[in-house]
Swiss-Prot record:
<feature type="disulfide bond">
    <location>
        <begin position="26"/>
        <end position="48"/>
    </location>
</feature>
<comment type="similarity">
    <text>Belongs to the DEFL family.</text>
</comment>
<comment type="subunit">
    <text>Forms oligomers in its native state.</text>
</comment>
<feature type="disulfide bond">
    <location>
        <begin position="22"/>
        <end position="46"/>
    </location>
</feature>
<dbReference type="Pfam" id="PF00304">
    <property type="entry name" value="Gamma-thionin"/>
</dbReference>
<dbReference type="InterPro" id="IPR008176">
    <property type="entry name" value="Defensin_plant"/>
</dbReference>
<feature type="disulfide bond">
    <location>
        <begin position="16"/>
        <end position="37"/>
    </location>
</feature>
<keyword id="KW-0295">Fungicide</keyword>
<feature type="disulfide bond">
    <location>
        <begin position="4"/>
        <end position="52"/>
    </location>
</feature>
<keyword id="KW-0929">Antimicrobial</keyword>
<dbReference type="GO" id="GO:0050832">
    <property type="term" value="P:defense response to fungus"/>
</dbReference>
<dbReference type="InterPro" id="IPR036574">
    <property type="entry name" value="Scorpion_toxin-like_sf"/>
</dbReference>
<comment type="function">
    <text>Possesses antifungal activity sensitive to inorganic cations.</text>
</comment>
<dbReference type="InterPro" id="IPR003614">
    <property type="entry name" value="Scorpion_toxin-like"/>
</dbReference>
<dbReference type="GO" id="GO:0031640">
    <property type="term" value="P:killing of cells of another organism"/>
</dbReference>
<protein>
    <recommendedName>
        <fullName>Defensin-like protein 2B</fullName>
    </recommendedName>
</protein>
<keyword id="KW-1015">Disulfide bond</keyword>
Length: 52
């Protein structure tokens, strides 16, 4: 199943530096399949992955 990336709507900890925390946020709070930190300049974002 294809997953589509979407910035977390609940991440409020500023720059994302902890993949495990981001993944837990996405799975538990946003009901996504996966989550990880995306590192584009100028800020790191927590990205959640949902079924498309």
């Amino acid at each position: 199943q294809k997953l589509c990336a979407r910035p977390s709507g609940t991440w409020s900890s500023g720059n994302c530096r902890n993949n495990n925390a981001c993944r837990n946020f996405c799975i538990k709070l946003e009901k996504s399949r996966h989550g990880s930190c995306n590192i584009p300049f100028p800020s790191n974002k927590c990205i959640c992955y949902f079924p498309c």
